[in-house]
Amino acid sequence: MVADTDAQAQRIADEAYPRWRDGMDFLWRRSNLDFTLKDIYPGDFAALQAIGHGIAGSPATVRDYLARLQAETGVNYVLCQMVFGSMSFEQAEQSIRLFASEVMPAFET
């Protein structure tokens, strides 16, 4: 999730993620089963970020995170879920636009 500021991106992600997470474990709950992916997809976005499975921030924060990931692992591509949970169209559009215009160019070769 990319927004103009770290605080704005974090707020949007914190609000949107629970709805997405609820949908992820719906079938497990419906079948009275334990959600087996809870370690990969914890209950809130802060926990998701803490284990390195999510990022929300300004373009600079997201760019720095991806550059660090690339330097540490040699990764040459990432899969991004740009829209999730209860994000509005406007929030999603802004995130995608900022990612395309201010994050991606840093990784073009």
Question: Which sequence ranges carry the predicted segments?
Answer:
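Active-site-proximal loop/turn and secondary-structure-junction residues that shape catalytic pockets
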Residues: 1-2, 84-86
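Short, small-residue-enriched loops and turns at beta-alpha junctions
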Residues: 30, 85-88
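Hydrophobic faces of well-ordered beta-strands that scaffold small-molecule active sites
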Residues: 78-80
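An alpha-helical appendage that flanks or caps ligand/catalytic pockets
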Residues: 1-75, 108
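C-terminal helical cap(s) of enzyme catalytic domains, especially alpha/beta-barrels
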Residues: 91-108
